[in-house]
From Swiss-Prot:
There is a cross-link at K342 (Glycyl lysine isopeptide (Lys-Gly) (interchain with G-Cter in smo-1)). Disruption phenotype: Prevents the up-regulation of several innate immune genes following P.aeruginosa-mediated infection. RNAi-mediated knockdown causes a reduction in survival following P.aeruginosa-mediated infection. Prevents the up-regulation of mitochondrial protective genes and increases the transcription of oxidative phosphorylation machinery and tricarboxylic acid cycle genes following mitochondrial stress caused by RNAi-mediated knockdown of protease spg-7. Residues 462-469 are annotated as: Leucine-zipper. Residues 420-483 form the bZIP domain. The keyword Magnesium does not apply. Its main location: mitochondrion. It comes from Caenorhabditis elegans. This is Stress activated transcription factor atfs-1. Belongs to the bZIP family. GO terms for cellular component: cytoplasm; cytosol; mitochondrial matrix; nucleoplasm; nucleus. One of its GO terms (biological process) is mitochondrial unfolded protein response.
């Protein structure tokens, strides 16, 4: 309602919303409206509300904005103003020139006569002349500088301590426009001066002591509501370990029925007296001297359900369960390791051979593993190796592995002693035939190997082309799907 009224150009609507009258400067001072003008606005709002309620035809347009609205919506917005409680408050406006308060008279720099009334005592104060506000005035400082009637207010306050000035009346009038009018815009400029003059009687932003003001439906007593919250339980909930929430039986722990003095000192738990749920923190054991244990004999349904769902605690606890810290957990979640792999094997498994563009990835750890098995030390004891080997005099150690050289077999034929020329000639021909046969077989084997290598290379090239064609086909399908084609 106030957002809708704030867009008006009439005097009454802008006084209700406490908005500046000139749109060229939105930071101007709000108008200080007194009780007579508020009564006029009240009568106007009541007459308008009654006319809307008793009208049988459809209400076509919003009188403020010219926007079509229903009757129910207009009535709801008018009911938000709480007109009944505002109108029923006793008022005794004194006849003063402030009843015909002109807008041009206020903004042209002319002084305006304003009258006020104490809302609690029902006594009228004297009318005084209010100086018009100018853009150079600092109206938010709350001081009496620039206000010629400040000394007069101080004299009236000294004579009548309970009596408030018209600015206090203005604050009180604006606080009754609705229950949600706690904005700083509605605070009086002389609020700090009134607080200093009244002394012990504390006045809040609504113009009356907090103990005399009734809380509205839009407000909440924070101090009263915060007492119902178990802040200690929330701290344990936010600071507990993640493992506690995985195991509910460790989080909700029932206190034993019989508690001795020694057990109460050892198994002291922080719990809430209202909820009957004790919160157990596995990381930090609470000291028994500062946190006494509470009796958990609660009849609430939540605590009974927890007692049924959680396992029963032992009658007496002699020793506390060992607390597992984070630095004690040095194993993986999958379980302990059976063997520790070598660092080179771990990192070499990720080394992969690549061809030119897009080829098959072949792990390079298989050949290395076979060679590493040969280089590993055997299961034979050290003293047996020293006894059987010819190099037993060398300083053998567990980290020393002798290098293994490949032994080549000596090729050739052992020439027999010559017998005669015919026998030597036949042996020479046999050796020549054997060499030719071996060369022939070696050439055939080499040819087969080269042919196999050519076939393998051709197959690898064909696989690369196949993958490239598949990628091109998939990209073409995506383009066709973007254009809206249906592809099976």
């Amino acid at each position: 309602m106030f957002s809708r009224v704030g867009r008006l150009t009439t005097f009454g609507a802008q006084a209700v919303s406490n908005c500046p009258f000139r749109r060229d400067n939105i930071y101007q001072q709000p108008l200080k409206v007194t009780a007579p003008i508020n009564d006029q606005l009240t009568s106007f709002a009541h007459s308008f509300s009654d006319s809307v309620r008793h009208r049988t035809t459809s209400f076509g347009n919003d009188p403020f904005l010219g926007v079509p609205m229903d009757d129910d919506e207009v009535i709801k917005e008018l009911e938000l103003l709480d007109l009944d409680s505002w109108h029923t408050k006793p008022r005794a406006p004194c006849p003063a020139p402030s009843d015909e308060l002109e807008l041009d008279q206020f903004w042209e720099g002319k002084n305006v006569t304003v009258c006020g009334r104490d809302p609690r005592l029902g006594k009228s104060t004297d009318c005084f002349e209010l100086e018009a506000w100018r853009p150079t005035d600092s109206w938010q400082n709350g001081s009496s500088v620039g206000h010629p009637h400040g000394h007069q207010q101080q004299q009236q306050t000294c004579q009548q301590p309970p009596t408030h000035s018209s600015t206090t009346e203005t604050m009180h009038d604006f606080s009754n426009f609705g229950d949600n009018m706690g904005s700083p815009l509605f605070q009086s400029p002389s609020k700090s001066a009134i607080d200093q003059l009244t002394g012990t009687s504390r006045i809040d932003e609504y113009g009356m002591p907090p103990q005399d003001r009734k809380l509205s439906k839009f407000e909440m007593d924070i101090e009263q509501e915060s007492k119902a919250v178990d802040w200690e339980a929330w701290n344990h909930y936010l600071e507990s370990d993640d493992d506690v929430f995985k195991r509910p039986e460790a989080f909700f722990k029932e206190e034993p029925m019989i508690m001795t003095s020694s057990d109460s000192l050892m198994t002291s738990s922080t719990s809430s007296p209202d909820s009957g749920i004790s919160l157990y923190d596995p990381m930090i054991p609470p000291p028994s001297s500062h946190f006494p244990s509470f009796n958990l004999s609660s009849s609430s349904s939540a605590s009974n359900l927890l007692r049924l769902s959680t396992p029963s605690a032992p009658m007496q606890q002699e020793h506390r369960a060992p607390v597992r810290m984070h630095h004690d957990v040095d194993l993986f979640s999958s379980g302990p390791l059976l063997c520790v792999p070598k660092q080179e094997d771990v990192f070499d498994d990720f080394i992969q051979q690549r061809d030119d563009d897009d080829e098959d990835y072949i792990p390079a750890s298989e050949a290395r593993r076979t060679s590493s098995r040969l280089n590993r030390k055997s299961a034979t004891p050290t003293y047996l190796r020293r006894r059987d080997s010819e190099r037993s005099w060398t300083p053998a150690s567990d980290d020393y592995f002798p290098e293994e050289h490949q032994k080549f077999k000596k090729r050739g034929v052992v020439l027999k002693p010559s017998v005669d020329e015919e026998t030597d000639r036949r042996r020479m021909l046999n050796r020549i035939a054997a060499v030719r046969y071996r060369e022939k077989k070696r050439a055939e084997k080499k040819g087969r190997k080269m042919e196999f290598q050519e076939v393998a290379d051709r197959n690898r090239i064909l696989l690369q082309k196949e993958r490239q064609l598949k990628r091109e086909i998939n990209s073409m399908k995506k383009e066709l799907r973007k254009m809206g084609a249906i592809i099976q």
